[in-house]
Design a protein with these regions (language model features):
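Alpha/beta enzyme core
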Residues: 2-271
Length: 271
């Protein structure tokens, strides 16, 4: 059996051209990075979703750059064959293109092989600036979690006509802007599948969907949702296992054995 090759940024474009679909999943530490890499995932996203999944926040806004550097470094230590993408958190690129470059350098030094940021037209200058220092950028349009307050929550985008933020025509403009600014790929989140498919057909870079139907060049999900560790019931989430229930059962058994004195037994004790 041939050893799996390291995934690189140019691979994403080649796979789009050949029709090979791209799998991306989140990980925030070395242990889970190794697990998803062994499963054969193409891209590991060190997402600012860590704020909700691990830290217990109701949205991603509180996550800061230092935290993303920490988690990116942990994932990078796993030495995965999968491409490692680091999320630029809210407040780390909005102030200026210079800030965006400096934040991207910090994530790259931590081990990110590509950075991701949210937005379209209004972040095109930041994307262009980051790519000028040879750091690959992945865009993210549609339901952008860092725009939680403007959207009034995590709401599907692109259902209305017009050119205002979140409208169908604006999302098409956002996709073009991200591509023209030099992004190597773009995540499309929380939009009608027909629109995501149209965007995929009209842009020349890979699209990776989440809650955007099956017409994108790839898909991304949060690992904790895939494993059934979360209790998310979002329409676009699929639990491929029920590790939450399994984990509760295992810990309960441990608690019971401690309380009865059954643990540790002779086989797990030194003489």
């Amino acid at each position: 059996m041939n050893e799996r090759k390291k995934v690189t940024v140019p691979d994403l474009g080649r796979w789009r051209e050949s029709g090979r679909r791209i799998s991306m999943i989140t990980a925030y530490d070395a242990m889970f990075a190794r697990i998803v890499d062994e499963a054969g995932v193409d891209v590991i996203l060190v997402g600012d979703s860590v704020g909700m999944v691990v830290q217990g926040h109701s949205n991603t806004i509180p996550v800061d750059l230092g935290e993303m550097v920490y988690h990116t470094r942990n994932v990078a230590r796993a030495g995965t064959k999968a491409l490692v993408v680091g999320d630029l958190p809210f407040g780390s690129y909005q102030a200026s293109s210079q800030q965006a470059v400096e934040s991207s350098i910090a994530l790259t030094k931590a081990g990110a092989e590509c950075v991701k940021l949210e937005g379209g037209v209004h972040v095109a200058d930041a994307i262009a600036a980051i790519t000028r220092v040879d750091i690959p950028v992945m865009g993210h349009i549609g339901l952008t979690p860092q725009s939680f307050h403007r959207m009034g929550g995590h709401k599907v985008q692109g259902r209305v006509e017009g050119y205002e933020a979140g409208s169908r025509n604006r999302l098409l403009e956002d996709a073009y802007a991200v591509e023209q600014a030099g992004a190597c790929a773009v995540v499309i989140e929380g939009v009608p599948m027909e629109l995501a498919t149209e965007i995929t057909m009209k842009v020349g870079i890979p699209t990776i969907g989440i809650g955007a139907g099956n017409g994108c060049n790839g898909q991304v999900l949060v690992l904790h949702d895939v494993l059934g560790l979360s209790d998310s019931n979002l329409k676009f989430v699929k639990h491929y296992a029920d590790l939450r229930r399994t984990s509760i059962s295992a810990v309960k058994q441990y608690v019971d054995e401690v309380s009865t004195g059954a643990w540790p037994d002779a086989d797990h004790s030194f003489t």
